[in-house]
Each structure stands twice: as structure tokens, then as C-alpha cells.
């Protein structure tokens, strides 16, 4: 099992990053709350990973902190929650925000996440609220970690930041029309792809 990677970032296309380690490029899916914390292309990064093997694919999911991986692994234990939905959940909320929402049984906040309906939100609360008591130490994330930052430094603007932002939101589980509406709502001159995704996810909560 691949549990940790250290390498050079070759490409960043949210929610996926291509990391080169010893001449091998690994495609890693990351929650947007982790993606924002990555260094720029060409720089070194360390990512904690969870390896998923399916009949039709082998997928790597990556996290900046071990605690975020612990929460991801707890999420995919919930009935009806697979890796892609867990990725979307942790893209819409930081680990601490999600834990707080579950502990406070904030169903209305949870249903705003992509792919989460009322039944799934209720199931998340019922199945996960008691797990946090035994995992409080493992799930503790240092203050500021995993939170959506106020600003993102990006040296280069993609040719179509709005299009890339919409594609990233669709990959996270939003319907194309909804993703387009979310991006249009927060679009402004000078915004890059990551800024648009960040602001769209913020506005959705």
C-alpha cells in the first residue's frame, strides 16, 4: 500500500495533482481544502495517501495531514459513502468544520455538500458522531490546517480559469449547470482557477 509520497509537483489540475517520485508520476486526487495548501508547480511536496483498488481502476487520494486521511478513512466506512463522495465532502468543508457539523447534528449544513442528500446527511451524523470521541486525538488538526485560505498565490493564470473551475466542481460531484452557476456567481477579473473554486465552495455553505 502507498501511504506517503515525497516528490516534485509536475501538474496541478484541481482536484488532481501529478507528483513525480524517483522518475514515476503519481496522479493523486486531493480534497480542495488540501489542494490549496500545496506548493507551486516545480516545488517539492509531501502527501499522505490512501490507495483504492477497484475492478476498473487504481486510485490514490492524498492529504496534507495524517489527520485528514484518518477522517477520510472514517468517512468511507459510512454506508453509501465511497472515496469520491468523501473527497467531495472534505472539499466543501475542512476537517474541523465537518466534525463540528456532525457533532452539532447540522443536517442543513451537510446537505449543501455535493452528493449529500438529507438521508446521507442523517446517516453521517448517526454513524460518525460517536466515532469522534475515540478518535479525537487522531482527528485533531492544527489550527489553520485544512481551512480554506483567504488568498492563494498563483504565478500563472490558466487560459480559461472559469472553465477549469467548473470542471473541477463537476469532478467533485456538482452537476454541470450548478457548477457553472456557482462559478459565475463568484467570478471576478483576475481570479484564477483555485480562487474561483475556493470562493464557489465558500458561497455554497
Swiss-Prot record:
InterPro entries: DNA_helicase_Holl-junc_RuvA_I, Hlx-hairpin-Hlx_DNA-bd_motif, NA-bd_OB-fold, RuvA, RuvA_2-like, RuvA_C, RuvA_C_sf. Homotetramer. Forms an RuvA(8)-RuvB(12)-Holliday junction (HJ) complex. HJ DNA is sandwiched between 2 RuvA tetramers; dsDNA enters through RuvA and exits via RuvB. An RuvB hexamer assembles on each DNA strand where it exits the tetramer. Each RuvB hexamer is contacted by two RuvA subunits (via domain III) on 2 adjacent RuvB subunits; this complex drives branch migration. In the full resolvosome a probable DNA-RuvA(4)-RuvB(12)-RuvC(2) complex forms which resolves the HJ. It holds the Pfam family RuvA_C. Has three domains with a flexible linker between the domains II and III and assumes an 'L' shape. Domain III is highly mobile and contacts RuvB. Keywords: Cytoplasm, DNA damage, DNA recombination, DNA repair, DNA-binding. The gene is ruvA. GO terms for molecular function: ATP binding; four-way junction DNA binding; four-way junction helicase activity. The RuvA-RuvB-RuvC complex processes Holliday junction (HJ) DNA during genetic recombination and DNA repair, while the RuvA-RuvB complex plays an important role in the rescue of blocked DNA replication forks via replication fork reversal (RFR). RuvA specifically binds to HJ cruciform DNA, conferring on it an open structure. The RuvB hexamer acts as an ATP-dependent pump, pulling dsDNA into and through the RuvAB complex. HJ branch migration allows RuvC to scan DNA until it finds its consensus sequence, where it cleaves and resolves the cruciform DNA. GO terms for cellular component: cytoplasm; Holliday junction helicase complex; Holliday junction resolvase complex. It is found in: Cytoplasm. The keyword DNA-binding applies. Residues 1-64 are annotated as: Domain I. Belongs to the RuvA family. It comes from the Bacteria. This is Holliday junction branch migration complex subunit RuvA. Residues 144-156 are annotated as: Flexible linker. The keyword DNA repair applies. NCBIfam families: ruvA (TIGR00084). GO terms for biological process: DNA recombination; DNA repair.
Amino acid at each position: 500500500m502507498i501511504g506517503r509520497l515525497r516528490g516534485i509537483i509536475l501538474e496541478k489540475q484541481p482536484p488532481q495533482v501529478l507528483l513525480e517520485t524517483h522518475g514515476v508520476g503519481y496522479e493523486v486526487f486531493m480534497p480542495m481544502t488540501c489542494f490549496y495548501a500545496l506548493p507551486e508547480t516545480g516545488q517539492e511536496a509531501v502527501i499522505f495517501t490512501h490507495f483504492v483498488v477497484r475492478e476498473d481502476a487504481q486510485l490514490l487520494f492524498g492529504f496534507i495531514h495524517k489527520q485528514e486521511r484518518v477522517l477520510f478513512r472514517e468517512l468511507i466506512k459510512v454506508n453509501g459513502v465511497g472515496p469520491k463522495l468523501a473527497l467531495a465532502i472534505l472539499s466543501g468543508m475542512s476537517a474541523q468544520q465537518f466534525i463540528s457539523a456532525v457533532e452539532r447534528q447540522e443536517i442543513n449544513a451537510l446537505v449543501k455538500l455535493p452528493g449529500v442528500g438529507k438521508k446521507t446527511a442523517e446517516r453521517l451524523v448517526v454513524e460518525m458522531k460517536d466515532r469522534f470521541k475515540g478518535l479525537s486525538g487522531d482527528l485533531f488538526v492544527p489550527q489553520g490546517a485544512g481551512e480554506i485560505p483567504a488568498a492563494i498565490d498563483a504565478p500563472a493564470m490558466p487560459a480559461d480559469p472559469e472553465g477549469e473551475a467548473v470542471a473541477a466542481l463537476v469532478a467533485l460531484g456538482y452537476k454541470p449547470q450548478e457548477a457553472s452557476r456557482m462559478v459565475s456567481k463568484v467570478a471576478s477579473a483576475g481570479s484564477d482557477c483555485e480562487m474561483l473554486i475556493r470562493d464557489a465552495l465558500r458561497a455554497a455553505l
